């Protein structure tokens, strides 16, 4: 599972309740991980961290024969696509919720500003100077949930750091330029009223991807935070769609006989399919202690929930 640990906690519970083992860690500098807050020096380092961590879980005996799915929201969707690019045959599929295939023009700095910032990124990489609109206001529709997010001290709410913003921009461009290379099964979910990441680029991913098994669902009137910022009835609908998609693909032996689903155009945690969910505390060193996080170089024990 790749995304924001605070926002994805409830998502992990939903998937675990549906019978899936859910794993994740904080990105470096995010959540409870070490490092400068929300500073990304190189996006590829973040992807490498995710790759090592998730594969270490998949190599454990109890999960070795399970189907493996990526789950990514927003920036985590870009991470999921880059993990697939890094090892195209490893993952059995991905759920991509409002993926960062392209940053919306409505929150992106003016091109002239980007040019100026690029010239000083190696001099002041950690400065919080990138002008941008308030993403929390733009992402979370439900006012009560929005205020809850604002009050959480683990949620970064300053201006983006210079290097971080430029890395996100470069990554989104790279992802957008390589949409045709995506070959794994995937399910894209995107709010049509999203002003943070562009739903039209999600549609382009669906159209250009080489995947034989691909599904997209666009939700009229919904914003960026589909699983954490919408009214409860919308959140329930989104999770119902996610679990239904995973359930149809969670057995490898059945995958070969599946027919590709039709796209729902009218309307990327790693999950180990059918892993038992136990209410007991995990054994020391057991993977079951990890739930709903992001990637980072921090000790994964910090992310135990």
Description of each model-found segment:
Residues 184, 198-207:
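Short alpha-helix in the alpha/beta-hydrolase fold that links the catalytic acid
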Residues 12-35:
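Conserved alpha/beta-hydrolase
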Residues 160-179:
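Active-site nucleophile elbow and catalytic-triad environment of alpha/beta-hydrolase enzymes
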Residues 182, 188-190, 194:
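Short beta-strand/loop motif that positions the catalytic acidic residue
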């Amino acid at each position: 599972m790749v995304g924001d640990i605070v926002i994805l906690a409830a998502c992990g519970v939903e998937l675990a309740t549906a019978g899936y083992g859910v794993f994740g860690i904080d990105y470096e500098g995010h959540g409870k991980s070490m490092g400068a807050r929300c500073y990304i020096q190189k996006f590829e380092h973040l992807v490498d961290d995710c790759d090592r961590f998730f594969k270490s879980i998949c190599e454990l005996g109890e999960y070795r024969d399970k189907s493996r799915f990526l789950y990514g929201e927003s920036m985590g969707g870009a991470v999921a696509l880059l993990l697939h690019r890094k090892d195209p045959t490893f993952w059995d599929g991905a759920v991509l919720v409002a993926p960062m295939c392209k940053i919306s023009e409505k929150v992106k700095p003016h091109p002239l500003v980007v040019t100026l910032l690029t010239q000083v990124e190696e001099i002041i990489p950690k400065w919080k100077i990138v002008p941008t609109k308030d993403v929390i206001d733009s992402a979370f529709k439900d006012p009560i949930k929005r205020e809850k997010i604002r009050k959480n001290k683990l949620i970064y709410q300053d201006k983006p750091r210079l290097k971080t913003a430029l890395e996100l921009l470069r990554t989104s461009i790279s992802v957008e330029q390589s949409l045709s290379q995506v070959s794994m099964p995937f399910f894209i979910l995107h709010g049509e009223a999203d002003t943070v990441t562009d739903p039209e680029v999600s549609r382009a991913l669906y159209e250009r991807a080489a995947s034989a098994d691909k599904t997209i669902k666009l939700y009229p009137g919904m914003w960026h935070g589909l699983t954490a910022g919408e009214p409860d009835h919308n959140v329930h609908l989104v999770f119902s769609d996610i679990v239904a998609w995973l359930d149809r693909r969670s057995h490898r032996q059945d995958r070969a006989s599946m027919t590709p689903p039709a796209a729902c155009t009218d309307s990327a945690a790693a999950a180990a399919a059918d892993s038992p969910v136990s209410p007991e505390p995990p054994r020391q060193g057991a993977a079951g202690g990890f739930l709903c996080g992001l990637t980072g170089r921090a000790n994964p024990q910090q992310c135990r929930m």
